[in-house]
């Protein structure tokens, strides 16, 4: 029934103290999993299935501290990071690569965190990697700032991020028009 569906959706938007605690717990345990990923990166380098070394480190924390992984972990190194929702996790991890990890732990209450990070395999970004990483981080921060404004719609959050990305692409000479032109309805 449509009315029930709408009411349930509204209820899901508001969290009580218990739900907030569980969401925070899911994030804390997921963060611990990411910390273990960082610790195993040196072992993953050169391993024929280094992506699985990364996935396994996260899965161990998820199983020990929660119900397990809340969804299939993406551990995509190098060119695999270009494949949307890469879950094979069967590739090598090479020095100089970036590894994209999207993972979350499901805690006992069934709440699941969802964290995505791009990590430099050797612990340091190249100059170009750092510039791109900073642009994405700035876009994320702009989106979060917009999300915290009263009356904000999802589209407003998306637009805030896209404004930053368009500006950076223009600064770097990649965007052939102004950011305003690219973001206008005609530029879409």
Residue ranges and their predicted role:
Residues 1-188:
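Active-site neighborhoods and metal-handling regions in enzymes and metal-associated proteins
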């Amino acid at each position: 029934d449509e009315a029930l569906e709408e009411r349930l959706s509204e209820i899901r938007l508001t969290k009580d103290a218990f739900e907030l605690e569980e969401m925070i717990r899911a994030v804390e345990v997921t963060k611990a999993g990411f910390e273990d990923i960082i610790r195993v990166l040196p072992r993953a380098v050169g391993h024929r299935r280094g992506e699985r070394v990364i996935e396994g480190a996260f899965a161990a924390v998820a199983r020990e501290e929660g119900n397990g992984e809340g969804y299939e972990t993406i551990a995509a190194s190098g060119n695999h990071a270009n494949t949307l929702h890469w879950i094979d996790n069967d590739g090598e991890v090479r020095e100089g690569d970036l590894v994209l990890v999207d993972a979350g732990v499901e805690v006992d209450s069934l709440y699941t965190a969802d964290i995505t990070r791009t990590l430099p395999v050797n612990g340091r970004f190249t100059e170009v990697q750092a510039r791109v990483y900073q642009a994405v981080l700035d876009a994320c921060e702009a989106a979060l700032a917009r999300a915290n404004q009263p009356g904000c719609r999802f589209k407003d959050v998306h637009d805030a991020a896209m404004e930053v990305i368009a500006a950076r692409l223009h600064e770097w000479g990649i965007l052939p028009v102004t950011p305003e032109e690219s973001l206008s309805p005609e530029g879409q």
